[in-house]
Amino acid sequence: MKWVESIFLIFLLNFTESRTLHRNEYGIASILDSYQCTAEINLTDLATIFFAQFVQEATYKEVSKMVKDALTAIEKPTGDEQSAGCLENQLPAFLEELCREKEILEKYGHSDCCSQSEEGRHNCFLAHKKPTPASIPFFQVPEPVTSCEAYEEDRETFMNKFIYEIARRHPFLYAPTILLWAARYDKIIPSCCKAENAVECFQTKAATVTKELRESSLLNQHACAVMKNFGTRTFQAITVTKLSQKFTKVNFTEIQKLVLDVAHVHEHCCRGDVLDCLQDGEKIMSYICSQQDTLSNKITECCKLTTLERGQCIIHAENDEKPEGLSPNLNRFLGDRDFNQFSSGEKNIFLASFVHEYSRRHPQLAVSVILRVAKGYQELLEKCFQTENPLECQDKGEEELQKYIQESQALAKRSCGLFQKLGEYYLQNAFLVAYTKKAPQLTSSELMAITRKMAATAATCCQLSEDKLLACGEGAADIIIGHLCIRHETTPVNPGVGQCCTSSYANRRPCFSSLVVDETYVPPAFSDDKFIFHKDLCQAQGVALQTMKQEFLINLVKQKPQITEEQLEAVIADFSGLLEKCCQGQEQEVCFAEEGQKLISKTRAALGV
């Protein structure tokens, strides 16, 4: 059973069961009930995002037809209604339009959804979303001459097509983020069309946009996967921690209010409710900016930006400084009160306030580390109040909570030490060996992609100051592991990976760190084909040569996951000797055929395969 179902997180679920319950039980009104929308809404672009994300293979013409029909079916609000507040949620109308398009749904394999009830139908369409559909090619930067002409002739249609292309390639990317990057792309085009070297301008500036889009898409998909697999409670626990770290001067009641509404917005965004995702996000940002004097002095410049720009700016803004007079630790936070005598509601509030107070004191820690500390603290209290001396038990136990931080620090020190010693490429090779042993069922390209990100994380985070290193490393590892878990959900890897992915969000990374070798894996029969070497090894350079060497490394470990470090070093030394000998000779292909076979025989004998 997931630890997030413990009392520690029940209070968070209570916040989101309904806005009425939240307001009645805690006396806190939701921001989303009171704030008005301030920005003009382009329903055509929003509807385009919706239909392109839900039927990714549909052509632009097909999506445009669905958009037109859906918007025609929606009653236009009067001027008074429009100015008085926000548009109503149009999700049901969009889903109805999807189901009216029987030919399109049949064509792309979505027709099974419309026979279900409203909620089931929605979930069915969500399940059809694919992060990287094979039928859709990577986005290519448009040819400048044609693009500039099309943009000048009909800017609105040109930008709507761009939104369509982005949405279908990134089905989990939040609508406001798509609109934000579309707006930035809209600014790039006129300047690049006038540039002396338009091709270079487009390639350079558009490459930045597409890179940021990919990264934003990964983050949004990760957030949605956490909410789906671990529930709203876990997501809200994450949000409590992040907001308390960012807004260190804010009291617990205000954090509660923000947690409710931030999680509510993410839920809309993850379910493809494009209108509520946009409007409710705007409300929260408007509220935060209206309260910036009390929330944080780090967001002043953010609040001067457009509504779309504010969100990204605030999210990436620095944490506020710790308030003066804040005690360095939370020793005896409970005091002499008997935790086991608390009512369920009292326990909820107390533990929530502990998370808030701990987070604002430790902005340098990763969210997952703080959640591990919080779980440990709950278990400590439950244990101590069954002893004769609860206070003494607490004092000893609170020192033990440091083990969660120390484990994270030790991992960071070890990883950065290896990075300094080996460099990024050889560190990736070390990760390759470790993760091929943990998950030999992954393809070579998957293993290389995962470990490349891990090595890049070390290269980035190990350059940071100590107060930023831990959060950087653990945070990046959480995203990388999260996407491995999304892959496992689609195509199961092995029981060990499955256990780590599903048992506990907070403990996912330590769980993966503790995996060594997948004992359920049965290596395939030895095949010489995977170890045949050719003269192209001598011709390859840079990344191409590194990739070939890594393929050899992966195949070797997959053949014998229990291979020792000494055995591995010996085989690699022999392989390097083979390259040196054959690449210096005239008859390279003959050399590889003869000497390569000797290497294979020697390796098989040494490994017993």
UniProtKB/Swiss-Prot annotation:
The lineage of its organism: Eukaryota, Metazoa, Chordata, Craniata, Vertebrata. Glycans are attached at N42, N251. Binds copper, nickel, and fatty acids as well as, and bilirubin less well than, serum albumin. Residues 19-210, 211-402, 403-601 form the Albumin domain. SMART domains: ALBUMIN. GO terms for molecular function: metal ion binding. It is found in: Secreted. InterPro entries: ALB/AFP/VDB, Serum_albumin-like, Serum_albumin/AFP/Afamin, Serum_albumin_CS, Serum_albumin_N. Plasma. Synthesized by the fetal liver and yolk sac. Gene3D superfamilies: 1.10.246.10. Keywords: Copper, Disulfide bond, Glycoprotein, Metal-binding, Nickel, Phosphoprotein, Repeat, Secreted, Signal, Sulfation. The modification Phosphoserine is found at S111, S115, S117, S344, S444. Disulfide bonds join C99-C114, C113-C124, C148-C193, C192-C201, C224-C270, C269-C277, C289-C303, C302-C313, C384-C393, C416-C462, C461-C472, C485-C501, C500-C511, C538-C583, C582-C591. Dimeric and trimeric forms have been found in addition to the monomeric form. Cu(2+) binds at H22. This is Alpha-fetoprotein. It comes from Pan troglodytes (Chimpanzee). GO terms for cellular component: cytoplasm; extracellular space.
